[in-house]
A protein has these predicted regions:
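Proline-rich low-complexity regions
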Residues: 8, 35-38, 87, 96
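Generic hydrophobic alpha-helical scaffold/packing signal
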Residues: 10, 53-57, 110, 114
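A long amphipathic alpha-helix within ATP-dependent nucleotide-binding catalytic cores
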Residues: 28-73, 121, 125-128
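C-terminal active-site "lid" helix and adjoining low-complexity regulatory extension at the edge
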Residues: 72, 77-129
Length: 129
């Protein structure tokens, strides 16, 4: 596709039984969570997630950054769970962490998203000249 960047997958490793809001947002008393790029996924699993995320992006005519969440079973089959069209942009959020693993700095992520938004901006339909 033109200009689409597929970022590395992240696996959430936590001592909690669930990856819930408390775990995700951290803070005092929250279970520790670590985001790692899984090294042990079979190639077909990585390809299925990459291709699936790209197809979703195109099908929904997305712009900017999205996050597609998958769960992978013990056979390596990936199942799409949801599409997040407004992923978090705090430095410790999933999108900036995945960008960091891809060599994209936090500043590059933010300026890239802003530049794309400005380039694609159109006047609102209710604005008259």
């Amino acid at each position: 596709t033109s200009g689409t960047t597929i970022l590395p997958s992240l696996e959430f490793v936590t001592e909690s039984a669930y990856y819930d809001e408390t775990t995700k947002l951290g803070g005092e008393g929250a279970p520790k969570v670590e985001y790692v790029v899984p090294e042990d996924f079979p190639a077909h699993t990585v390809k299925a997630m990459t291709d699936g995320a790209e197809r979703v992006y195109e099908f929904l005519s997305c712009r900017g950054a999205i996050r597609v969440d998958f769960v992978v079973d013990e056979t390596g089959t990936a199942f799409a769970l949801e599409v997040n069209t407004t992923p978090g942009l705090q430095e410790h959020s999933n999108l900036p962490v995945s960008c960091a693993h891809a060599g994209i700095s936090y500043a590059e992520l933010l300026t890239g998203l802003l530049a794309q938004a400005l380039a694609e901006a159109r006047p609102a339909p209710w604005v008259t000249s």
